[in-house]
């Protein structure tokens, strides 16, 4: 019963044809009232489809995602083709899955089911090779161009939670990542820092600010032969989180789908039980 988005997001010109066709196909399927949606693709396709279903008004649509993309990390993409072939209807069960709603000012951008990443790059595949590519060029021109992550996404990042600025985090992070913690077992895992404090709370998400990019195929010393620094902040259903002061070249990657930002800002909130996904046993 929760309103998502308000107005349907219009994709940048370069992707408008693809996204419009995808939305039209989803709308046709939705009108048929299927018991579940079978999806073959990657996390980006899954995010586009699930977001459209929720925006259209589908109440907790059941989505069975089959891996066919670059990363296939889920939670919607839950099975391989081989696993699907051995699956029987009596063994299919679903579980509710939270999402993160991303807005740029009053403009709805996307729902993220795995993560929302702020940077200038995203992960993709070119001629069968997994590469780090320029997010803005893909969004605006439809071009997959190899790129190197920025050294920083802001000179003085401001994080606001429920109208109050939260200080003490990295002011010039290389990347910012937001994700729900519903699918993760953080109980007793003190090594995870603040994330272990979310154990037992079903509808919790986290913001992590990093001094080196982790969403990248580039090999880096941070975390291996050099320290990586992270600032973590938890938020839950009902909270409103905003990030301000982002550089113009910073783009939102919602489950790998690029969305340019205006005025260097992003607002995020957690949406409880947005869809239902295949439950692994």
For each of these PLM feature ranges, what is it?
Residues 1-36, 47-51, 84, 89:
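ATP/NTP phosphate-donor binding region
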Residues 35-36, 62, 273:
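Structural motif
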Residues 38-44:
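N-terminal glycine-rich "phosphate-gripper" loop used for MgATP/nucleotide binding
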Residues 49-80:
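Short, acidic/small-residue loops that bind anionic groups at enzyme active sites
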Residues 64-68, 87, 119:
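Generic beta-sheet signal
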Residues 70-112:
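Short, glycine-/small-residue-rich phosphate/pyrophosphate-handling segment
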Residues 94-221:
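ATP/pyrophosphate-binding catalytic subdomain of soluble kinases
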Residues 192-281:
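ATP/nucleoside-binding phosphotransfer catalytic cores, i.e., glycine-rich phosphate-binding loops
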